[in-house]
Amino acid sequence: MAFPVISTYRVQMRGRSNGFGFTFADAENLLDYLDDLGVSHLYLSPILTAVGGSTHGYDVTDPTTVSPELGGSDGLARLSAAARSRGMGLIVDIVPSHVGVGKPEQNAWWWDVLKFGRSSAYAEFFDIDWELGDGRIILPLLGSDSDVANLRVDGDLLRLGDLALPVAPGSGDGTGPAVHDRQHYRLVGWRHGLCGYRRFFSITSLAGLRQEDRAVFDASHAEVARWFTEGLVDGVRVDHLDGLSDPSGYLAQLRELLGPNAWIVVEKILAVDEALEPTLPVDGSTGYDVLREIGGVLVDPQGESPLTALVESAGVDYQEMPAMLADLKVHAAVHTLASELRRLRRCIAAAAGADHPLLPAAVAALLRHIGRYRCDYPGQAAVLPCALAETHSTTPQLAPGLQLIAAAVARGGEPAVRLQQLCGAVSAKAVEDCMFYRDARLVSLNEVGGEPRRFGVGAAEFHHRAATRARLWPRSMTTLSTHDTKRGEDVRARIGVLSQVPWLWAKFIGHAQAIAPAPDAVTGQFLWQNVFGVWPVSGEVSAALRGRLHTYAEKAIREAAWHTSWHNPNRAFEDDVHGWLDLVLDGPLASELTGLVAHLNSHAESDALAAKLLALTVPGVPDVYQGSELWDDSLVDPDNRRPVDYGTRRVALKALQHPKIRVLAAALRLRRTHPESFLGGAYHPVFAAGPAADHVVAFRRGDDILVAVTRWTVRLQQTGWDHTVLPLPDGSWTDALTGFTASGHTPAVELFADLPVVLLVRDNA
């Protein structure tokens, strides 16, 4: 029997073969705590067999089996039964777009293709570019082409260091290089930009699957189907939907396979002006859009101008950021994804019946003008024609190439599909993996699904989007933190407070730059905000935090790719940044930063509580990311996959003194007792009245729940509530957080006397 999905709690599964772990048995031991917290469903990261020692599970090597490292099928069955006995259920993250091939010997399908080539039973499972290598699969696994000379034959294997590859039957005689020349694959240096198969973005160790082939879908989803047939699982999250050839077709097959009652949400990164395609047979998205709205409504718009001036003082013309992003898209297409661009060119030329030297440049230029991950959903039909027209208007010299693109795409088929897949990959590499590490104005806005150039979200827009979601997607996921977010929810909340005190932050940055100038001013401003976001209130920087900050700084500057990068590390610049960071952590600025954090921490906690209560009560199904019941200082992965101290959280849940777990437990428990108010209930804004009315965001869910949170508390601290009231609907209302009772026009000063948020329940409801 499936249970209605009212809320979820995400855990990161991990085998114990690589340090700490979190298996099905560990999850089973957590169920009593989650049940007490009020969670309806435990939400598992990918659980199919992945590369040995995988720390995340997105590198699945065998889609037909549950990971033995996690406890196998028996462990999953025990976990499901234990959850069912408590009236709870399971949600599982699935990865249809790709599989892990970084260790070829662990992926039987990939191994078979490498061994038998086009005659393999699995040759059509992968999106292989057979033309690129004259019938051989190009594998960019070498440091340089000359490494082929070091290949050695070991029985029916070719070896190079830790790399092992199969030898085709009857081709194993001779030296390593000679045997290599007779294989169905060809090893090349990775710097050539050649790859013989579609990848997950530019990650060579993740090979794309052809889910559009029904045989591939059936083979890769048989195990997932079993979970639903046997009643083990109630829903799935679909990873990287836009990487598929036909997302809509895939979801239609998935819905048919899993049944009408399965809860299906999709990882779909939506542009600010983009709606989730209404024809998709799903319950909604994974909530990046809601994350942007919640974070944005708490940002103080008065901070935009001074924070813009501050980042421009470092030599950045903020008005040029859109042009920079456009250039990054071109770079991603032409360089990072060069192999995919070459393949698309051949497809377009074949479909159009002609080629042109300007075709690659035309594709890259076109992608500059497509402001979303892909635009072939029915509701986005106008995007590509408009982008073609805009590209022609700005770069008329590319007309010959644009004409070929238009002609080929109009016919549909492979060129149209590959253009869309390249568009998504280009967007990810340019925006999330680079631009979000360059924009230093207010880095809490640099989030998956976010738009940093839009400084916050107005209350009217917030209410409009929430009401629309209540009507169209009432069971969509809402979230504040995921394994993909650039920083944890509480880190974002603290950084967001800088929008309220831009003058104070500018003063600190000016002093910091004078005492400890960063190797690069913009890099310094970017890193300073992140350091501020995780800085302990006590000012005591542990060895663990020091290491985490150094790891983060190195990742950030390589992703930004201004002075160093993953492909071409600039060790001198990186050493300078590490030295500067040590000076920050150990020098005189540390005490000054501690004072600033202490001064603003109450405001940061207020925003964090407001964001959490909003996420738990706006239309949708809220997800709680592991460990975020208490203040969480996580940064980007792998930092956000650290082990969680559940002993401390169990104690906190019993005491309910910590404000965050208090808010969380009250809201989750209320959702469980009043599901009709949250899953089916309407959304109605409630407006405060008085001089400080703008400091309140409030709404009703159904007839018996009213939520109100405060914002912009720095200004509020200066002005006070000054007779501001919140008009409550008829009846008596009790705050589930404090027990405070109210009715009628209630003074805000009384309503928010104990906490900056209230969760009101109509008495006798």
From Swiss-Prot:
The keyword Nuclease does not apply. The keyword Isomerase applies. GO terms for cellular component: cytosol. It is an enzyme of class 5 (isomerase). It catalyses: 4-[(1->4)-alpha-D-glucosyl](n-1)-D-glucose = 1-[(1->4)-alpha-D-glucosyl](n-1)-alpha-D-glucose. Monomer. This is Putative maltooligosyl trehalose synthase. It comes from Mycobacterium tuberculosis (strain ATCC 25618 / H37Rv). The lineage of its organism: Bacteria, Bacillati, Actinomycetota, Actinomycetes, Mycobacteriales.
